[in-house]
């Protein structure tokens, strides 16, 4: 049975790699809504080039692969904040706890917001005196459970909402994932499907207007109230499949690699590569490279550090992480995250 699972996984991975050579003429970029759902959550995952589907094991697993939540013990809290691209702010927070005999549950919040800007019109290009902003938000509940010593499953359900000024839209989405520790020592396989849900469209009082239904005919009705209708767009569906494992696995030194193949519905297929070195189970050095094989990719090298330290000689730990990721012409993104394990 295990050999069949491994063979099937290798077949799926090989098929994903083959897609890198096919269907490269149409990328479908810009054809989905709620693009913030693709922003990598967690300093560790971002530092490792977003190669995390097989090796995730902390609260950010609710983003990468909810099956990874099954590795959590006790109670954990995680938060991160960073200035994202083009002056926007990105925030992610999560709370999780292990329910013995049932599974691990988590609640997560993701927010992407823009600063205030002037409302401009054709008649008033310098501003009307009003200001607007935009905000994307996702609230999700996740569960992960180990079915055996080797196989873990997980799922998430989340409410996805987008707003710009007085117009907004929302929908529901689900994520599912699996992780499998192979009989091959220190090798883990993982796969997940993220953002499977209904299409999303915007509506609100910004869409309201008054029009003359027949401007060429003078009559008693000069203007009637009308409403713009916006098209509905699909969510950014992601299929990830990956492999990870320990190159070195000793008491005081651990070197971990990760490779993910990603098939999105709004871009070309690509690979993510990541590497992590952990010293004394306290200090980590990370590096990664995302977007390999993606045409016109702007992502570059990402680097990161992590510190996991006991609190006052107890089993509780404090986790502090830092990541610097290169986004080419859009600049460098720096991220700091903080976690507590009880």
Stretch-by-stretch model annotation:
Residues 1-31:
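Cleavable N-terminal export/targeting peptides
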Residues 19-342:
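Subset of outer-membrane beta-barrel
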């Amino acid at each position: 049975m295990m050999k069949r699972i491994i063979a099937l996984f290798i077949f799926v991975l090989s098929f994903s790699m083959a897609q890198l050579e096919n269907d490269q003429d149409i990328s479908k970029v810009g054809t989905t809504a709620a693009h913030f759902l693709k922003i990598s959550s967690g300093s560790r995952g971002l530092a490792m080039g977003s190669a995390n589907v097989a090796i995730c094991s902390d609260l950010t697993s609710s983003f990468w692969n909810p099956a990874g939540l099954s590795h959590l013990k006790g109670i954990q809290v995680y938060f991160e904040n960073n200035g994202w691209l083009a002056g926007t702010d990105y925030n992610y927070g999560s709370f999780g706890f292990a329910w013995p005999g049932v599974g691990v549950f988590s609640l997560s919040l993701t927010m992407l917001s823009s600063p205030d800007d002037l409302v401009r019109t054709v008649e008033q290009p310098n501003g009307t005196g009003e200001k607007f902003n935009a905000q994307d938000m996702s609230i999700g509940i996740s569960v992960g459970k180990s079915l055996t010593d080797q196989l873990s499953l997980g799922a998430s359900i989340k409410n996805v909402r987008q707003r710009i000024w007085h117009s907004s839209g929302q929908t529901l989405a689900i994520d599912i994932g699996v992780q499998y520790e192979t009989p091959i020592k220190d090798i883990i396989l993982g796969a997940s499907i993220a953002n499977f849900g209904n299409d999303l469209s915007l509506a609100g009082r910004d869409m309201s207007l008054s029009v003359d239904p027949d401007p060429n005919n003078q009559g008693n009705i000069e203007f009637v109230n009308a409403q713009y209708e916006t098209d509905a767009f699909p969510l950014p569906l992601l299929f990830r499949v990956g492999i990870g494992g320990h190159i070195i696995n000793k008491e005081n030194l651990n070197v971990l690699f990760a490779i993910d193949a990603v098939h999105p519905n709004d871009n070309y297929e690509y690979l993510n590569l990541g590497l992590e070195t952990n010293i004394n189970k306290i200090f980590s050095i990370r590096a990664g490279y995302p977007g390999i094989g993606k045409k016109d990719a702007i992502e570059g090298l990402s680097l990161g550090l992590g510190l996991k330290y006991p609190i006052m000689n107890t089993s509780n730990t404090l986790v502090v992480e830092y990541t610097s990721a290169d986004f080419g012409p859009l600049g460098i993104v720096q991220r700091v995250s903080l976690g507590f394990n009880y």
